[in-house]
Amino acid sequence: SVGFVIYPKQQKIVLTFGMFAGNKWDVPDDNCYQMIDQVIKEFEKEYPNVTIKYESGVMKDDYSEWLSQKALKGDLPDVFMVLPEDFSTFSSVGMLKNLDSYTKIDKAFKKSNYYEGSYDAGTYKGTQYALPYESVPTLMLVNKTLLKKEHIKMPGNHWTWDDFYKICQKVTKDTDGDGRLDQFGVYDYKWNDATLSNGGNLFNQSGTKCNLSSEPIENAILFTKKIERISSFRNLTSDDFDSGNIAFRPMTFSEFRTYKPYPWKINKYFDFEW
């Protein structure tokens, strides 16, 4: 006798994806669709019964309204990006799916693959509603040439506020004897930069409470003022840093990519090592 095994035909599935053009940090990004298209291509190859579609051309400034209108019409994409400023609202009104059950049963999923801070940003009241797509850390750029000139060792990865303050204090000076300061410690260092380096956060993990009156933020504000006092509260500009007259400058990684020579139109060149 001859036996036949009949397998059910795989059902065709269409998934919709919501995204905006560019990125959250407003720096040039020619690859936003290229990256998504590549991921879709690989996913559809692994799951040939699934087709993924998305609407291109939605700008970041219009994205929140576009997504909200989709929600009101009951036409939300199956998977979509969420801007940080919308996350708490969307989570609280039920627009986002609880992902905890999925992360627990997916053997390929590893929380350790994400930066802890980025992963936690997708948590609302103890529940995971989103996963990071892009993570952009803030870097501290260092003018190595200036530190070498002043016989100062490069700070290590575990440097402290006190180390930072002492270096800023040492490099800030009048180098040409005209009675005016022309070399400085740091440019564009804000209280929120100090807060993050001090383990503080502006909001609690669920985004429901502001921590402005907390001790870490209070200390960060006081430290920032202390740093500014070294340079007599001078209104410094990026040109001062570009000219090699400032030792430090905080900058996000996305800004850094377009600041140094990179395949964008915004290219800057320096006469010092950093």
What are these regions (language model features)?
Residues Y124-Y133, T138, D162-C210, I246:
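Extracytoplasmic/periplasmic solute-binding protein
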Residues D100-Y114, N157, D176-G177, F184, ...:
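Short, solvent-exposed loop/beta-turn-alpha elements that line the ligand-binding surface or hinge
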Residues V58, P84-P137:
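Hinge/lid segment of periplasmic solute-binding proteins
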Residues I167-C168, S206-N235:
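Glycine-centered hinge/linker elements that transmit conformational signals in sensory
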Residues D78-M81, A247-T252:
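Paired acidic/hydrophobic, glycine-rich loop segments that form the ligand-binding mouth/hinge
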Residues S1-T89:
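Conserved N-terminal structural module of periplasmic/extracytoplasmic solute-binding proteins
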Residues E42-K45, T51, W264-W274:
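Extracytoplasmic/periplasmic substrate-recognition and gating elements
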Residues S56-W66, W159-Y165, F233-S243:
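Short helix-initiation/N-cap motifs at beta->coil->alpha
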